[in-house]
Amino acid sequence: MLARRIIPCLDVKDGVVVKGIQFRNHEVMGDIVPLAKRYADEGADELVFYDITASSDARVVDKSWVSRVAEVIDIPFCVAGGIKSVEDAKRILEFGADKVSINSPALENPALITELADRFGVQCIVVGIDSYFDAATGQYQVKQYTGDENRTRITKWTTPDWVVEVQKRGAGEIVLNMMNQDGVRQGYDLTQLKLIRDLCKVPLIASGGAGEMVHFRDAFQIADVDGALAASVFHKGIIPIPELKAYLRNEGVQIRD
């Protein structure tokens, strides 16, 4: 396996970076471009930007900030938000993004995954999955339109089945957003990650729950994920990226410089 990746996640709403808890009650974290530059300078391996209300608002991500981010950072970045067509993805990639991620639009039209992979290559196509553990049924369920709590809905897919399906259709990477853990900083859902890791033959990125450095270590060493995505611990300065990388190296995790 290649070196593991540390990936700050920047949720974008109304032109600024926000962060919620379990996808609700978002507070402003700062401006997009300065935060992106800060993380690149601190040693992040990659950045992910989610325009969290684009799909629920039936629009495509605002491209004006995509080009500004591309001008100030020299690490790969991925953009998500309402991408419903090859043309939508093409424009975002032309503005400077290295990858595009689709989530709700893929659930609406699974064939879109294949169309994008055929046009741009699987290495450019990430599928985000918002997974919710239903304690009543004991199942992991995929949710859609999670950027707007009034429109969020449970889909017909269980998370394991959707993970298998998106790989068949050409997903080059999967970001597993674990909704129950999101923003509460109690650790990634290692049980879910191990379950999905066994089904996932493409790079798997853990998202939701990081609160301490050991949580990153456990995601890499116990669940064998390729990357760990986090937001609030980076936005609020709880975990500095250089210190996190030094810790992980010391714990035997192969990490990029």
UniProtKB/Swiss-Prot annotation:
The active site is at 11, 130. It catalyses: 5-[(5-phospho-1-deoxy-D-ribulos-1-ylimino)methylamino]-1-(5-phospho-beta-D-ribosyl)imidazole-4-carboxamide + L-glutamine = D-erythro-1-(imidazol-4-yl)glycerol 3-phosphate + 5-amino-1-(5-phospho-beta-D-ribosyl)imidazole-4-carboxamide + L-glutamate + H(+). One of its GO terms (cellular component) is cytoplasm. One of its GO terms (molecular function) is lyase activity. It is found in: Cytoplasm. One of its GO terms (biological process) is L-histidine biosynthetic process. It is an enzyme of class 4 (lyase). Gene3D superfamilies: Aldolase class I (3.20.20.70). Keywords: Amino-acid biosynthesis, Cytoplasm, Histidine biosynthesis, Lyase. Pfam families: His_biosynth (PF00977). Pathway: Amino-acid biosynthesis; L-histidine biosynthesis; L-histidine from 5-phospho-alpha-D-ribose 1-diphosphate: step 5/9. CDD domains: HisF (cd04731). Its EC number is 4.3.2.10. Its main location: cytoplasm. PANTHER family: IMIDAZOLE GLYCEROL PHOSPHATE SYNTHASE HISHF, IMIDAZOLE GLYCEROL PHOSPHATE SYNTHASE SUBUNIT HISF/H IGP SYNTHASE SUBUNIT HISF/H. Belongs to the HisA/HisF family. HAMAP family: HisF (MF_01013). IGPS catalyzes the conversion of PRFAR and glutamine to IGP, AICAR and glutamate. The HisF subunit catalyzes the cyclization activity that produces IGP and AICAR from PRFAR using the ammonia provided by the HisH subunit. Heterodimer of HisH and HisF. This is Imidazole glycerol phosphate synthase subunit HisF. It comes from Tolumonas auensis (strain DSM 9187 / NBRC 110442 / TA 4).
